[in-house]
Amino acid sequence: MEIGFIGLGNMGLPMAKNLLSAGHRLIVFNRMKEKAAGFQDASVQIAESPGEVASMAKIVLTMLADDNALRSVVYERGLSQAPSFLETLPQGGVHVSMSTVSVSLAKELAAVHALRGQAFVSAPVFGRPDAAATKNLGVVVAGEGTLIETLRPVFEALGHTTFVVGQEPYLANLFKIGGNFLIMGAIEALSEAFALVKKNGGDPEAFLKVVNAALFHSPLYENYGGMVLHERFEPSGFRLELGLKDVKLALEASEGARVPLPLGGLVKDRFLMALAFGLGQKDWSALGLLPLIEAGIKKP
């Protein structure tokens, strides 16, 4: 299958390599061209713009940092005023957005693509860069059913499970935002519990073992608990500053649906505090330092 791929960052690059390993032909674009230049393979073409990718491939995957980056790729013509991605994707072409973006943007893109006879599928992923490299992502997909079946080999080249959650693309983004909201809450709760145990003379590592064995046997608690305990915040799998973006996505969706998220407001403030301490470029699990600082266990 010939696939366009836009966005070769910490997640996008290993994902693109896995598509290549699965035998797909790629047309790639990245704003920082040196990332794309790393592909030395006859099955890869390097495009000069998102519009060029869309003109050469009927299926295009985007893996970008946020709403602004995705809007820029879809709508903007760039300095050369070459046709945009939206203008050059052919009728019947498919845009698969794998980014964590807002529910409102997913709805908008579904509408604008439909007006041009194009299809839009949302397929954000659960997993960090190491999971992307080992094809161990969970792919959450929403879109038209027969189209998803056509795309299934693409998703299977990227992850261990494809979760189809509905026909409306925004539903996949809603599930991803909700899942990330749970991760944020877990990091905060774990870290507060670690501070409680440590300040009272207990061993947080032993506590985590008990929690994983007796209460919440979960990769989430095991992985993030270990990262917080051992302060494995670099290299960053997901920057803390992007965590603030994700909690804002949850709050935006909740406001639009009139759903109170009191924990969301708290977590947003925790991210702001972490940014004030200069932790923005560290992994978002560095949020777990705050309870230790506040308890006087660590210095700011």
Spell out what each predicted region is.
Residues 1-63, 93, 129, 161:
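NAD(P)+-binding Rossmann beta1-loop-alpha1 motif at the extreme N-terminus of oxidoreductases
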Residues 15-16, 35, 109, 154, ...:
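Hydrophobic residues within alpha-helices
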Residues 26, 46, 120-121, 162, ...:
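Hydrophobic beta-strand scaffold residues
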Residues 50-55, 59, 64-68, 72-137:
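Rossmann-like NAD(P)(H) cofactor-binding subdomain of soluble oxidoreductases
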Residues 100-184:
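Rossmann-fold dinucleotide-binding core
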Residues 171-295:
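Helical "substrate-binding/catalytic lid" subdomain
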